[in-house]
Amino acid sequence: MVKVSFKSVFFLFWPFLFFSGTLFALPQKAPDFDLQSPQGKLSLNQLRGQVVLIFFGFTACPDVCPISLSTISRVFHQMEEEEQQKSKALFITLDPERDKVEMMQEYTGFFHSNIIGLTDTAETISEVAQSYGVNYQKKKLERSALGYVINHSADIYLVDSSGMLVKRYPHDVEPEVLVAKIRNLLGH
């Protein structure tokens, strides 16, 4: 019989306690995707030459999603117009059942015009989320008009203008941190 102490198990797994999604080495080539935007299909490769922030969530999210999108909005408001023209943010839904293209456009419009809402089939969204290490799960809500919510990891991904995934930030990152990194990537 092998005895395993709590300490040995804890020290083996402790690094994973502080990350909300799957771990992967950075920088690395950002996984490309082809999702529905208000203007038709949009791939990450189409945004080459721009710095891109990516956040996964859903429009009925009561807390972390609007807070994260507000943070991203504040990032754009702190940037010069020229910097804004060289950057975008993508809000990828984890709830394609409810979040249709029109809903995504209306929702992201509340935050900033540089934020593009993306949706697609549940299968496609699952593949994209998995490629970014996003964990999510549908949870039924008894006695709620919503019927369900999506529990999900909540990182903000930063992709440079050459398509490299360079950094992953927690959802509560200060906007100034993102602005400084984007400016650095833009050479300002």
Predicted features by range, described:
Residues V9-T22:
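Bacterial N-terminal signal peptides
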Residues M1-K7:
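N-terminal secretory signal peptides that target proteins for export/translocation
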Residues Q28-A30, L47-V51, Q84-A89, D99, ...:
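Extracytoplasmic
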Residues A30, E106-S153:
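Short, internal strand/loop/helix patches
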Residues G21-R48, S70:
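N-terminal "domain-start" segment that seeds a small globular fold
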Residues N45-S68, I72:
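Short active-site neighborhood of thiol/selenol oxidoreductases, capturing the structured segment around
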Residues L69-V128:
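Structural microenvironment flanking redox-active thiols in thiol-disulfide oxidoreductases
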